[in-house]
Amino acid sequence: KEGYIVNSYTGCKYECFKLGDNDYCLRECRQQYGKGAGGYCYAFGCWCTHLYEQAVVWPLKNKTCN
């Protein structure tokens, strides 16, 4: 599974500005989803890879980013 890492309180994606390989995104994806996860910056959001199927990713139901 893949997807944008999301703040469960706000419903917002984690923003990034250095597109492609991005240490911040990799660190955040691994912290939230485990050491096996990958991450990079895609379309100014942190995109996580190698997630377990039940992983929660953006968008969240009933939560809009404000």
Swiss-Prot record:
Keywords: Amidation, Disulfide bond, Ion channel impairing toxin, Neurotoxin, Secreted, Toxin, Voltage-gated sodium channel impairing toxin
Disulphide bridges, residue numbers: 12-65, 16-41, 25-46, 29-48
SUPFAM superfamilies membership: Scorpion toxin-like
UniProt note on tissues of expression: Expressed by the venom gland.
Molecular function as annotated in GO: sodium channel inhibitor activity; toxin activity
Domain of life: Eukaryota
Cell location: Secreted
Protein family (similarity comment): Belongs to the long (4 C-C) scorpion toxin superfamily. Sodium channel inhibitor family. Beta subfamily.
General function of this protein: Beta toxins bind voltage-independently at site-4 of sodium channels (Nav) and shift the voltage of activation toward more negative potentials thereby affecting sodium channel activation and promoting spontaneous and repetitive firing.
Protein's name in the database: Beta-toxin Chui2
